[in-house]
Amino acid sequence: MGSKRIIPSRHRSLSTYEVMFTALFAILMVLCAGLIAVSWLTIKGSEKDAALGKSHEARGTMKITSGVTYNPNLQDKLSVDFKVLAFDIQQMIGEIFQSSNLKNEYKNSRVLQFENGSVIVIFDLLFAQWVSDENIKEELIQGIEANKSSQLVAFHIDVNSIDITESLENYSTTSPSTTSDKLTTSSPPATPGNVSIECLPGSRPCADALKCIAVDLFCDGELNCPDGSDEDSKICATACDGKFLLTESSGSFDAAQYPKLSEASVVCQWIIRVNQGLSIELNFSYFNTYSMDVLNIYEGVGSSKILRASLWLMNPGTIRIFSNQVTVTFLIESDENDYIGFNATYTAFNSTELNNDEKINCNFEDGFCFWIQDLNDDNEWERIQGTTFPPFTGPNFDHTFGNASGFYISTPTGPGGRQERVGLLSLPLEPTLEPVCLSFWYYMYGENVYKLSINISNDQNIEKIIFQKEGNYGENWNYGQVTLNETVEFKVAFNAFKNQFLSDIALDDISLTYGICNVSLYPEPTLVPTSPPELPTDCGGPFELWEPNTTFTSMNFPNNYPNQAFCVWNLNAQKGKNIQLHFEEFDLENIADVVEIRDGEEDDSLLLAVYTGPGPVEDVFSTTNRMTVLFITNDALTKGGFKANFTTGYHLGIPEPCKEDNFQCENGECVLLVNLCDGFSHCKDGSDEAHCVRFLNGTANNSGLVQFRIQSIWHTACAENWTTQTSDDVCQLLGLGTGNSSMPFFSSGGGPFVKLNTAPNGSLILTASEQCFEDSLILLQCNHKSCGKKQVAQEVSPKIVGGNDSREGAWPWVVALYYNGQLLCGASLVSRDWLVSAAHCVYGRNLEPSKWKAILGLHMTSNLTSPQIVTRLIDEIVINPHYNRRRKDSDIAMMHLEFKVNYTDYIQPICLPEENQVFPPGRICSIAGWGKVIYQGSPADILQEADVPLLSNEKCQQQMPEYNITENMMCAGYEEGGIDSCQGDSGGPLMCLENNRWLLAGVTSFGYQCALPNRPGVYARVPKFTEWIQSFLH
């Protein structure tokens, strides 16, 4: 039976599930189409919004003036320094805008770069829609001024430096146009398609116009522009020969013809760069320049380059620089046409291939050979041909040829103004397997020649002296030699120590030979006896002098006294008598050498006078039957000295006492007692009206019971009829501010008393009384006069970790003291006409006060014409009578201004502390001054400020064991060092903030160098001298 296959039909109805799936698929297709359409519309809308300016990116710049210091790492966007600071800036910007009226529009920010000039920040801002530049700038400034970011505690932004412009992303740049040696910035209108960055003064734009860098960074051998345009040879090609970067192993550059001066001066600069590890040798085929036109040769490039030679007039011979990079600059300031300039060639060489004798041997005919000037000394050796000036010191010819054609080296010629070390260093020398002989010729001629020393040192900082000569050896070249046997790498150093005036030292023909030094064929030189034998500096004594043995002199009088002398004479009189000291002749080196006269025995005596310089000087009178005279000289010049005598008697120099019914004025004259404190000056010096009211039994210098002096008797004020106006009037008489409070005080006895009433003209009427109504006295408290308040708003800043530039007006009581035109010390303004400073500043400089000048309101010593500045001469100097220069105790002095000053925002007095007020250890106080910023460095231009913690005297004594830290001193500083006052800060304030007023806690006195660990600064403790200071103010 056959079978039959059944084929299903092609058309059938869909199942329920199939219908559902089909419907869902169709819906999904519609949704996708819709989403695509919405996305397309959104994109087109965004493009339209962008076209209409609804999405916005702006670029901004601002300057951070404190809280962060610029360093080269901020140029590297991958550095930790860049990332940390950029994060903080972006956080600050975000916090400000998120709390501003633009919080809905603001999206984010991005720091692009940092530039030098404090720290300049360039950043981008992104907003969801278009915002005007003015609106962005206004919100940013308001946020900074309102401290809307926690980051503003860490650093300060100069709001005047903030600038906002359209982002440069959609704009083209205009490159700076150039001339031969000068860049100028073009500034087309800021319209879409064309914008150029505007640079701050002293900066120029890079070629991409995206970045500004300092003018000095152009053509300095280091890339500072991202596009490298700051070192572009087209820009940097010199006006002298059209060259700039020299990179071959040898080459040349020249200023064969001076370029015509288009400005006040022209600078031609070349960069020489050879392979790493090589050094560079320079030679001059000719060299004939004007004295004003200087060729400087530096080791290295960029900001780290080191000046190795300054050349003018004469061919310097060969110069070798031990670096693979050299910067050469030729500064042309003359318009002379008679000078042909110079032609220089350079060659690379490998100094490591030199042997020891090649490194040492030198007759200076061809420059300094391979010797190097010591950069850590005080001056430089000079290469000399022929005679030096002045006469009577230094050679007339070299040693090599024995005539004026040869060369030698000498310490700086001329009179000189100080003692200085002049050093010459060899390259590192290889250890020797056998001894070698170092030989040389030296010339030490002149009345004041000091010392020539030769040292060797190794990399372990072990140094030893192998040769030394001192004194004047006459007009001869002298031979010197020393055997060396060093087993490790070492250097040789020639050190000449030069005094003032006739003290030149010269060298020639240095050589190194193998084997020990032979016995010298030349006789050992002997010193020239050009001066008498040195006098002993110890006078003997102290000498006890009594009548009739009353005449005494400085040592060796009438001939010059010795240097470094210290002499003491004790003058004696019978009990009840006093002493008059008279100088018949007097001539000392000014300031440096002094006669100090004290009232009584030295240990606890009071200072009577300090005399120095040429005479005549005034007689001095003791108040006791003993007087101490000290004579102290330094190690420089000497003079003829002095001859003195003394007499004894009763009341010598003291005015005759007044009658019982008279008052004796401070100038000695007498006035009737009834005229005392009557409101009218009867004494010519006004002393009869000087001390007529005081506080009694007060807990502070501005409160207590009130007493008035009627004739010679003090009367306590009654509370009867006392008014608020009375309080104000009495407080004013006391030299204080307005009355703060007054209250009755019950007391029985203690008379006599005085009742106060106010006259119709407002003056006080005093009526003596034996009793007060209800035994009620007045207890008065006065406000202090306005003091210790900063008038110029100061930004909040973090704790200073080192001396920092202060803001103008930050310390309006800090005064700069100039002596003979030189900034010498600091001081503090305590009233309209009195300054507090250090006694050691004025010691020996007190006889002619008008040589001192006080500059108030000063911020920068380089700008003495600022409108905030007021200058006053000093007309009186008072050293605290307890000051002891040798013990450095009571180091405080008062200086009176010739004319009173008016208080301004930049000139204000500082407050005085209460007498014996305690400033506890650990308290953070402030110091300020223009002194040296590092030990043996240069003084500061801008007023420096720093915070320092106070130390106990016990701890200070442990850290300063060589000094006696007395109760009149206080100390401040960090154990780790790094913050301290230094030379030039003396006399300036140590200031502590209390109740929103700055108090003068200390006066900068002394220290051991500056800012060393466990070496605090020492200050005169002002609370110990408050009463003494106030005696000048009222």
Swiss-Prot record:
Domain Peptidase S1 intervals: 800-1034
Propeptide: 1-51
Gene: TMPRSS15
Post-translational modification: The chains are derived from a single precursor that is cleaved by a trypsin-like protease.
Membrane topology designation: Single-pass type II membrane protein
Coiled coil: none
InterPro entries: ConA-like_dom_sf, CUB_dom, LDL_receptor-like_sf, LDLR_class-A_CS, LDrepeatLR_classA_rpt, MAM_dom, Pept_S1A_enterop, Peptidase_S1_PA
EC number: 3.4.21.9
Recorded GO MF terms: serine-type endopeptidase activity
Pfam families: CUB, Ldl_recept_a, MAM, SEA, SRCR, Trypsin
Role this protein plays: Responsible for initiating activation of pancreatic proteolytic proenzymes (trypsin, chymotrypsin and carboxypeptidase A). It catalyzes the conversion of trypsinogen to trypsin which in turn activates other proenzymes including chymotrypsinogen, procarboxypeptidases, and proelastases.
All copies of domain LDL-receptor class A, residue ranges: 197-238, 656-694
MAM domain: residues covered: 357-519
Quaternary organization: Heterotrimer of a catalytic (light) chain, a multidomain (heavy) chain, and a mini chain.
Keyword Phosphoprotein: no
Name of protein: Enteropeptidase
Residue span(s) of domain SRCR: 693-786
Top-level class of the enzyme under EC nomenclature: hydrolase
Cytoplasmic side: 2-18
Annotated S-S bridges: C199-C212, C206-C225, C219-C236, C240-C268, C539-C567, C658-C670, C665-C683, C677-C692, C772-C782, C787-C911, C825-C841, C925-C992, C956-C971, C982-C1010
Transmembrane spans: 19-47
PANTHER family the record matches: ACROSIN-RELATED (PTHR24252), TRANSMEMBRANE SERINE PROTEASE 15 (PTHR24252:SF16)
Record carries keyword Repeat: yes
GO cellular component, one term: membrane
